[in-house]
């Protein structure tokens, strides 16, 4: 049997049989289970294709498994408080967790806590990275969505805390989900809220592109791979499909629930959504303790996978090459994660063996632009040419003097020769 190309990871609040279940979306067959505890809503993440991380529901630690050693916890990352949400950067270098109203950022290679972001006023509910790991997008119960430039966060001056690049405040009730499309710093971001709207934003400009109003609260959202459609899970158990390729007549518009644009099958609110890599299947989890696999074109449910409690996490991933091979091992060890900021009192010092390279902003004069550098270069060339010309003039003057002296000598010799010839002719 050929190895599957895609895998579905799902978790429920009960965690009686397993913390996380891995299964094949086409057949629904269970391939792996990870045991130990239960994971909080939006608290499940795959780190670098090597580790599975799950924020323990209601507890202040993160469970860590090697993808291959599913029956044994690798370690527990102790946190300052219960983990509300969790996300790993696509490049596998950073880990962020929402704890109360703060966002904690760790460096995976060293385990150092690099930053604590404190711009939200209430609990953080969802976190995600852009596909190039350059930005972090966070949503919270304070109805705010914040966009953080990762490298500006890492380069922040110690005299003041990190500040978000954008503060999107157009929602009026708690944020329930945040999803980012492809394109890195030029991607589009979809946000859903209990205010019955989903909003589409542009990271490059920070502008609101469109806002769609529903008749129910929206609890989850997902793009299809081509970003032609946006799938919105409602509190009534219905999934709504919004077309993004049609030009909106106005920036804020209502959603008209046509029969062919909805997925009906869940009996309770839809908590999480994910789309297959080829855009043909939609995976949904719900508080009705089921995960459904849908055919997007026909809007029909292909199968329903029962769970033991409300589904807290569901997402589909490209199958890691080492996930189904028990003999393989992670390519990098996971260090101990610090609870204190690097450089703070009580934090591990240099004797811990780690070296931090922090690229800070220059404190000296402002760096010149390319045009200013070009002007400076032109000025230097002009000075050089001026010096060369003055030196050349001096050389010409000196050479002229030498030639004048030689000419005088030649004239004297010519005069002497003329006088000598005249005397000879006169004597004859």
UniProtKB/Swiss-Prot annotation:
WD repeat residues: 36-75, 78-118, 119-158, 170-211, 213-252, 265-304
GO CC term (a single one): nuclear pre-replicative complex
One Pfam short name: WD40_alt
Protein's UniProt keywords contain Transport: no
Record's subcellular location: Nucleus, Nucleolus; Nucleus, Nucleoplasm; Cytoplasm; Dynein axonemal particle
UniProt cross-references to PROSITE patterns, sorted A to Z: WD_REPEATS_1, WD_REPEATS_2, WD_REPEATS_REGION
A biological-process GO annotation: rRNA processing
Keyword set, alphabetical order: Coiled coil, Cytoplasm, Developmental protein, Nucleus, Repeat, WD repeat
Cleavable signal peptide: none
Record InterPro entries: G-protein_beta_WD-40_rep, WD40/YVTN_repeat-like_dom_sf, WD40_repeat_CS, WD40_repeat_dom_sf, WD40_rpt, WDR18/Ipi3/RID3, Wdr18_C_dom
Classification via Gene3D superfamilies: YVTN repeat-like/Quinoprotein amine dehydrogenase
Protein family according to the UniProt entry: Belongs to the WD repeat IPI3/WDR18 family.
Biological role: Functions as a component of the Five Friends of Methylated CHTOP (5FMC) complex; the 5FMC complex is recruited to ZNF148 by methylated CHTOP, leading to desumoylation of ZNF148 and subsequent transactivation of ZNF148 target genes. Component of the PELP1 complex involved in the nucleolar steps of 28S rRNA maturation and the subsequent nucleoplasmic transit of the pre-60S ribosomal subunit. May play a role during development.
PANTHER family listed in its UniProt record: WD REPEAT-CONTAINING PROTEIN 18, WD-REPEAT PROTEIN 18
Protein name per Swiss-Prot or TrEMBL: WD repeat-containing protein 18
């Amino acid at each position: 049997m050929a190895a599957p190309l895609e895998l579905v990871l799902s978790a429920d609040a009960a965690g009686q049989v397993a913390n996380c279940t891995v299964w094949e979306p086409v057949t629904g067959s269970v391939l792996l289970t990870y045991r130990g505890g239960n994971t909080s809503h939006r608290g499940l993440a795959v780190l670098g294709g090597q580790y599975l991380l799950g924020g323990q529901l209601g507890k202040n630690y993160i469970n860590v498994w090697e993808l291959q050693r599913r029956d044994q916890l690798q370690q527990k990352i102790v946190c300052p408080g219960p983990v509300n949400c969790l996300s790993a950067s696509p490049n596998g270098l950073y880990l962020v967790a929402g704890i109360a109203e703060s966002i904690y950022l760790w460096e995976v290679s060293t385990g150092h806590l690099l930053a604590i972001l404190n711009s939200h006023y209430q609990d953080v509910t969802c976190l995600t990275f852009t596909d190039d790991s350059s930005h972090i997008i966070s949503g919270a119960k304070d109805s705010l969505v914040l966009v953080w430039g990762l490298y500006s966060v890492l380069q922040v001056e110690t005299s003041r805390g990190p500040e978000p690049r954008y503060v999107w405040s157009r929602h009026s009730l708690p944020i329930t989900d945040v999803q980012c499309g492809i394109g890195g710093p030029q991607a589009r971001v979809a946000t859903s809220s209990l205010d019955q709207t989903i909003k589409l934003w542009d990271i490059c400009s920070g502008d609101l592109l469109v806002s769609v109003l529903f008749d129910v609260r929206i609890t989850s959202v997902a793009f299809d791979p081509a970003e032609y459609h946006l799938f919105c899970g409602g509190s009534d158990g219905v999934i709504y499909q919004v077309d993004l390729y049609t030009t909106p007549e106005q920036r804020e518009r209502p959603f008209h629930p046509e029969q062919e644009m909805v997925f009906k099958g869940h009996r309770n609110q839809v908590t999480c959504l994910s789309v297959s890599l080829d855009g043909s299947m939609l995976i949904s989890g719900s508080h009705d303790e089921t995960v459904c696999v849908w055919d997007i074109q026909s809007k029909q449910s292909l199968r329903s996978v029962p769970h033991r409690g409300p589904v807290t996490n569901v997402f589909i991933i490209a199958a890691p090459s080492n996930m189904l091979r028990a003999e393989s091992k992670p390519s990098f060890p996971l260090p101990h994660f610090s609870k204190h900021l690097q450089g703070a009192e009580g934090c591990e010092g240099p004797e811990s063996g780690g070296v931090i390279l922090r690229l800070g902003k220059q404190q000296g004069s402002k760096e010149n632009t390319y045009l200013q550098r070009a002007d400076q270069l032109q000025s230097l060339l002009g000075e050089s040419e001026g010096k060369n010309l003055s030196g050349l003039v001096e050389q010409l003057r000196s050479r002229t003097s030498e030639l004048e002296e030689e000419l005088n000598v030649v004239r004297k010799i010519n005069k002497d020769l003329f006088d000598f010839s005249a005397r000879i002719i006169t004597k004859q």
